[in-house]
Swiss-Prot record:
One of its GO terms (biological process) is isoprenoid biosynthetic process. Its cofactor is FMN; NADPH; Mg(2+). Belongs to the IPP isomerase type 2 family. One of its GO terms (molecular function) is isopentenyl-diphosphate delta-isomerase activity. It catalyses: isopentenyl diphosphate = dimethylallyl diphosphate. Keywords: Cytoplasm, Flavoprotein, FMN, Isomerase, Isoprene biosynthesis, Magnesium, Metal-binding, NADP. One of its GO terms (cellular component) is cytoplasm. Mg(2+) binds at residue 163. This is Isopentenyl-diphosphate delta-isomerase. Homooctamer. Dimer of tetramers. Involved in the biosynthesis of isoprenoids. Catalyzes the 1,3-allylic rearrangement of the homoallylic substrate isopentenyl (IPP) to its allylic isomer, dimethylallyl diphosphate (DMAPP). Gene3D superfamilies: Aldolase class I.
């Protein structure tokens, strides 16, 4: 196996292990802790008619939840993705795949990403780093990634800080926006642009919307700090110190959501980054998100069993439903107008 392929696989293995065994939380908070719903002691609603359903990428969701992109490319990642997909199908929620760049150089890793046979009905998102468009990945190859997993959209993740704190990371982020526009015009499915834990600003959101991006995943600060993950991967003290110095970097998720909401118009917004519960998810919906994404606690559960993933998703959905009835919200549209105290 060529050296760069070995490095890709080793990096993916490192990322799973570090996320499961180390504290890689940002020191920033997501911001949702500052929002309090006004409790409705007399909601006049039957719990049995609470409707958490919505549509995303033209498909029906039983709840406004995305299992955010995590992993792929290794045997352990395959098991994790299979468990996540099984639960996503049963729960009627969306799922993103981990970065699929390795698939372009190591085609036999397809089994670690191919979950459509397990989850035939869900919105499924393929995924590659946006900066790879500056390093030879073509629109045709991106379409291949979509086709090979039968995805409904392609995530381009923006991970500039992570790349810059990786010894082997990509450094050239120049003229990337025109390449994103070229890809948007080429692909047969929508492009989702996603941060990885540092948030999207109003200015960046405007730029992406202008070139035709249809979905933004703000992925703000408050959850996993990928610079901290890279600090654990560092091979010398200087690399560790550089990466560790950015543990409080980024735009908190709530702030990013507010910024992006100002310019989003009718495009879909995914709120992720430090959301821990269905209550946080409800707050995200209230503040303008279309759906919300979670990863960290689901990764830990999926590394063990499908049952633990299922229990975690059931917990999140039940928290969402109880929040809805306690705010007098029969539907997600009602929830988006619920009374809050900031």
């Amino acid at each position: 196996m060529p050296k760069d392929q070995n490095l890709d696989i080793a990096r993916k293995q490192d990322h799973i292990e570090i996320n499961l065994t180390k504290n890689v939380e940002s020191t920033l908070k997501s911001g949702f802790e500052s929002i309090q719903f006004i409790h409705n002691a007399l909601p006049e609603i039957n719990y049995d008619i609470i409707d958490t359903s919505t549509t995303f990428l033209g498909k029906y969701l039983q709840a406004p939840i995305l299992i955010s992109s995590m992993t792929g490319g290794t045997a352990r990642a395959r098991d994790i993705n299979y468990r996540l997909a099984q639960v996503a199908q049963k729960a009627g929620i969306a799922m993103g795949l981990g970065s699929m760049r390795v698939l372009l150089t190591k085609p036999d890793t397809i089994t670690t990403f191919a979950i459509r046979h397990i989850a035939p009905d869900i919105p499924l998102l393929a995924n590659i780093g946006a900066v790879q468009l500056n390093y030879g990945v073509t629109p045709k190859e991106c379409q291949y990634l979509v086709d090979v997993v039968k995805a409904d959209a392609l995530i381009l993740h923006l991970n500039v800080l992570q790349e810059l704190t990786q010894p082997e990371g990509n450094r050239n982020w120049e003229n990337l926006l025109p390449r994103i526009q070229e890809l948007v015009n080429y692909l047969s499915v929508p492009v989702v642009v996603k941060e990885v834990g540092y948030g999207l600003s109003k200015k960046v959101a405007e730029s992406l919307i202008k070139v035709g991006v249809e979905v933004l995943d703000i992925a703000g600060s408050g959850g996993t700090s990928w610079s901290q993950v890279e600090a654990y991967r560092a091979t010398n003290s200087l690399q560790n110190r550089i990466a560790s110095s950015f543990i409080s970097w980024g735009i908190p998720t709530l702030d990013s959501l507010k910024m992006v909401r100002e310019v989003s118009g009718n495009i879909a917004i995914i709120a992720s980054g430090g959301l821990k519960s269905g209550i946080d998810g409800a707050k995200a919906i209230r503040m303008g998100a279309s759906i919300f994404g979670l990863a960290g606690q689901l990764l830990k559960a999926a590394d063990i069993s499908e049952n633990l993933v299922s229990e975690e998703i059931q917990l999140i959905i039940e928290q969402l439903k109880i929040t809805m009835i306690c705010t007098g919200s029969r539907t997600l549209k009602d929830l988006a107008k619920a009374e809050i105290r900031l």
